[in-house]
């Protein structure tokens, strides 16, 4: 978007360590971090018994420092999985809840003049989008990550960004066997979308 980006080895180290950009970076990358980042933390508790197994998990999503500090609430994927290896009718049950509505709040709150306006910023994380890279977290118009975040290839106005990244969904899945020759999988996903904080 903005022409040539910083590309020295020092800039590479800034990107992989999530550090602020140097003098050659845009003002935005000097205030936040250099480059575009999507970060995830995975937490899981599991139980294995003789007749059944259970797993509870949370995958925290964030795209900047405010999210790494969990200032984006409970955004991410919450799930439970139950497996019954000895009970073929229902071998596995999965229940998941995903929410990306908080995004550290609706406003970015980072003023570019930090000497005149010191303090913490954050908010308006705008998942999957990036101010420096207009195609955001996509590859040839397709979302890299959750398939529930509508890919830019579906934008009727041909814009390259993500227009609906604030979602809430519930996902249910069953897997089993009705007989030795008949397996089944049932899946149901119910979702709502709220566009972006800016929309």
Question: Model features per residue range: what roles?
Answer:
Residues 1-113, 170, 190-194, 198:
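Signature for the C-terminal beta-barrel architecture of outer-membrane proteins
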Residues 106-197:
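C-terminal structural cap/anchor segments
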